[in-house]
Structure formats: structure tokens, C-alpha cells
């Protein structure tokens, strides 16, 4: 009988913390400023989807362009590092 594959408990713990932080981010007492919202967005997208893909929104889609640019700055960042940064940002936000 083959042994069960080893679970990466550190990765599982990080994923659980990330999911808890994502839920907590939706329940903050005050709305974060736009710069913080962009950080949260970019860390979340990098953690869940990896490097940015597709074309940068153009024209008058200023919000879409800002989101794309924030996410693109994280190109090459590992998903785990992005998860850790997201968790830290949410913890900081909830302390304020």
C-alpha cells in the first residue's frame, strides 16, 4: 500500500490565514483609503491568480488601470509571499 502524500502544514496554515483575512477585510470598521484598497486588491489577485495577464484597461477606465498597475507591480512575487503580505495588510488595517 502506498503511503499517503505528505501535507504541507505550513502552506495549509497560510491558506487558512489568508482565507480568514479575506473574510475579515470585508468587515472592517472603517473604509480603507484608496492606496490601501489597491494594495489589498493586488496582493489578493497575485495570491489567487499569479502574475497579471491580459491588456491594461485604457481610455477612461481609471480604476481598472490603477488596479492593473498595482497588480503588475507584483509580477514575479510568489503566491505564498502575496498571501503573507495580504494577511499582514489586513491585520494592520484591523489594528487601526
Name these PLM-found stretches.
Residues 4, 10-59, 64-96:
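A charge-rich, low-complexity, intrinsically flexible signal that marks solvent-exposed coils, linkers
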